[in-house]
Every structure is written in structure tokens, then in C-alpha cells.
Amino acid sequence: MSNLLFDEPGPRARRRIRIATVAGTVAVLALLALAVRQFAANGQLDAARWQPYATWPMWRYLLSGLWSTALAAVVSAALAMAAGLALALGRLSRRRWIRLPAAAYVEAVRTIPALLLVYVVLFALPRYGLDLPLFWKLVVPLAVSNAAAFAEIFRAGILSVERGQGEAGLAVGLTPGQTMRMIVLPQAARRVLPSIVSQSVGLLKDTSLGFVVSYAELLYSGKVLATYNGLLIQTYIVVALIYLVVNASLSKLARVLEARRPGVRPPRRRFARV
């Protein structure tokens, strides 16, 4: 199945991709081997330095940070998806006074880093009497930033539904709103579900900006823990592995959902002579 953004690579392009993948893998493995060698030379791999992470109190503290990360990510995602759906419908509206502001919001917010929005909520809003609780100082800017991305995902899903589906709803007497709610949106939601999960992975990583507002998410908890026990490298390696496991699991879920979409077949390995 061809991609909307680029053509499917031919035999030569696939061969170059395989060569680049192998070369990149070898380079990464070489860097990892060099890093392990340096860690070993400086005593960072000594068992005594890793022994604290075999105890429950350490993991209980890190898992508490992971729970705070997950909570912030879930609430941010829920708000961003609700706002994104409203923006997507606004961009598809026939009324200019709705369509233009929605389009302006999406185009503007997509160019603003989430960190800048965090600084706005942290420093600018309190000057005007709006000092949010610590949790919302992280959640609000993440929701505002990701709403634009979810809006484009939902809009693409709505536009991918065949025009005849909406026309059939209108033909049986449904109003445009009922047609969108009962016929178009359910189909669009199923089609964009893998993209929603992928965007949620990025949102989960963005919760690491919580260190700016001193919100006790996973990365901030790791920073506090490393300051307390002096095991800087070990702590951040463990935190990185936790992020790796969680994000890899979500990415796997996105691929599974993509493969189970109606009309989508898993890619087959093809061999061609060059």
C-alpha cells in the first residue's frame, strides 16, 4: 500500500535503506560498547553502585514518579483530544468565523515549543492573577500544545471517510450534525487510533518538562534521587530504561492497532533482483 507522503521505495532504494540501517546499527553498538568500556574503567559498573536499585524503596520512589507521569499524560491527552476534536470540526466548518480561528490556532500553536508554553503558565500567568496548582502548570501547556496535533489527526481521519458515507446519512433524513456524530466520526476514530496512540507517546515524553515546574514526575524524581544517593549515572540509566519500556510498549500497541485496521495487511518481505 502506497504512503500518502512518499512513494514506496524500489529495489535499489530498499537496498540502500538496508545498508544504511546496518551501518547505523553498527555505529550505535560501537558507541554503546565505548560507553560501557568507559563506565567500567571509572568503576560505574561496580555491583555496589547498582545494589541500591535491587531494593524496593528505590523502586517504590521511582514508580511513584512514573505514576505521576502517567497521570499527567492521561489528563493532558484527554483534554488535548477533546480540544483537538473541536478544532478539527471547526476547521471543517463552512462558517468562516469558526473555520479561520480554528485554523489560526492550529497553525500558530504547532510552531510554538511546549517548553515555551510551560514558561508562559509558570511565569506570565501569575503576574495577571492566574496562579495554577502545580499539576495544572504542566498539564495545561501540554494540552494546549498537543491539541493542535490531535486536531490535524482527527481532521485527516474525517477527510479519509468516503464522501458517500455522509451523503447516505443525509439521504435517510439525518441532520449534518447527526451524520457527523453517528456515521463519520466513529469510522474516523477507528482509522486514526494508531496515530492517536503514537501522538500519546510523544505527549508522555513531554511530561519530562515537569522538572521545570518541580512536578514530581519520573525524570524529576530521578533527579532528586540522584542528588540524594550520589548515583547520577545509575539513576538516569534506570530512568531511561523505564521510559524505554513504557514508550516501546505504547509504540508496539500503535503498530498492532495499525495492522488490525480494516483493509490493512501486514507488510510482506519481498525480494527483487537489482
Give the positions of each predicted feature.
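Transmembrane alpha-helices and adjacent helix-loop boundaries
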Residues: 1-274
